[in-house]
Amino acid sequence: MPRKYPYYPSFNGGKASPVTVWFVKAMNRRWGFTNMGIYSNRTMKNPKAIEGDPKWLSVHATGWACDIGYTDRKVALIAWDWLLAHTKELRIAEIHDYAYKAPGATKAWGRSYRCSRGEGVKGVKVQTGPALGSPGGKWLHVEIENTWASAEEFQAAWKAIPKP
């Protein structure tokens, strides 16, 4: 069942959430991802964005979004599949895979998961144009719902899920 997307409108959370910090470290330990950024009070990277308009505030401003880089695409795909299979348990609101190239496409426009479209693969949209803004980028963008009471609560949910 689809969940309401929690970050429209976005807001300034003032700092990185301890949940997101723990998640980034866990992604590093398990798959070697690197932290490319969590909290940043800025406008979205979107050609339509109007600087200073709250409608265009990046989800990174909430402290609940992160960009995690990788060097091995095969490992990134394993991580994508695992996260996608557990969007409900981990309360993942959104994931962007910028390097995904759809069959028959001439460019890697990416794909995105959003909780309001459904859980797991039901919530994935394959991009056919520059909608995500970073085609071919070697990182995942992940947004976690701000409903976790603590990093410890999130950690327990993570550890309850079998490793891939």
Where on the chain are the PLM-derived regions?
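Secreted/periplasmic proteins that engage bacterial cell-wall peptidoglycan
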Residues: 1-115, 137-145
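Active-site or metal-binding loop neighborhoods of secreted/extracellular toxin and effector enzymes
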Residues: 116-164
